[in-house]
Amino acid sequence: TIAPLNFRVTDDGVEAVDVVIAGTKGKPVRLNGRSVDIPAKQWHELLESNKGDSIEVKVSVRQGKKWKEYRPFPIYVSPFPIDYGLVYRLLAPGYEVYSKMGIYERELSTFRQTPLFENTQVTAACINCHAFNRTEPTPSSVHVRGGHGATVIDTGDRLEFLDTKADGQLSACVYPYWHPSGEYIAYSVNKTNQAFHLGGKKPIEVFDQASDVVVYHPRSHRILTTPLLSTASFETFPAFSPDGRTLYFCSAEQKEMPVRYKDVKYSLCSIAFHPEDGTFGDRIDTLISARTLDKSISFPKPSFDGKYLMFTLSDYGNFSIWHKEADLWLLDLKTGAYRNL
């Protein structure tokens, strides 16, 4: 049920393109033109006819009045439908200046994109960190930075605009992750900075001067924390386990920043959480040590069945978006083994 996989042939001197997409069943799709825009109706009918099998794509191009056929390639058609949609932030690439940005919903069986929240609704605002409780539209959390900034929480029956910077807290709430019950939401609080390199392949470095992890209870409007998550170390990227009794996060030893930014490497850690009363365990467990890998872990995401945890691995730091060497890894939570994806 995925949307048509349109593509273009980018070779030089291409005058025409001929494409045939066919399976063992159903009516083949034949297209001509410089770009391949597959009609949605024909595409979905072909996929429906070949569920659990493969379709084959044959591409021919005309260059210099001669036709050349590329090697055909298969596309496997899953017997299961694709998820309904995705939600993401969309903005033009840049470092400091931005104009229009927002949080958008994309229907995966089509190319339909719907704005959920745009910064045109809030003057000169940066709309960024957002989270839903698993695959449900509510509850949700969106962070808005700027003169009219707030943490926006939709509990399903009310919409709240909150100043989440509590007394003595490093910042307002930043990276979010909902408790499966919807009764709590974990956040990191970060003093984040960016710097530009004078040379080299990485133009920019984003780093924390300090960071902690807290848990917010929307019903009582209380920030919950423990000294174990508010140390001199950098704690960030919280994520609850599917049963809601473990809080995963990343932690790195404090270094002089930005001088020693390459020495900051985050381990994957966890602490027990008791949803009955919103309290924490009395120790931190290290699941994967940065010292062992000599790498840095960021963005931990546990699977909903509780069997696995996916994370990003990079050379250093926690803002792996700017790191070309960053890659996804998968941790087996039962065996402790992890592998590159």
Task: Please describe what each predicted stretch is.
Residues 1, 26-42, 109-125, 154-172, ...:
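Multi-bladed beta-propeller domains
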Residues 1-13:
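Contiguous beta-strand segments within globular domains
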Residues 71-85, 93, 158-212, 223-236:
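Asp-box/WD-like beta-propeller blade repeats and closely related beta-sheet repeat scaffolds
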Residues 122-141, 166-188, 229-247, 257, ...:
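Conserved beta-propeller blade repeats
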Residues 49-64:
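Short, aromatic- and glycine-rich surface loops/edge beta-strands on solvent-exposed regions
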Residues 85-162, 168-169:
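Conserved, compact domain cores that house catalytic/ligand-binding motifs in diverse enzymes
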Residues 84-97, 187-209, 249-266, 311-325:
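Short, conserved, GDST-rich strand-edge loop motifs in beta-rich repeat architectures
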Residues 102, 150-152, 212-214, 267-269, ...:
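A short loop-to-beta-strand structural motif that recurs across blades of beta-propeller domains
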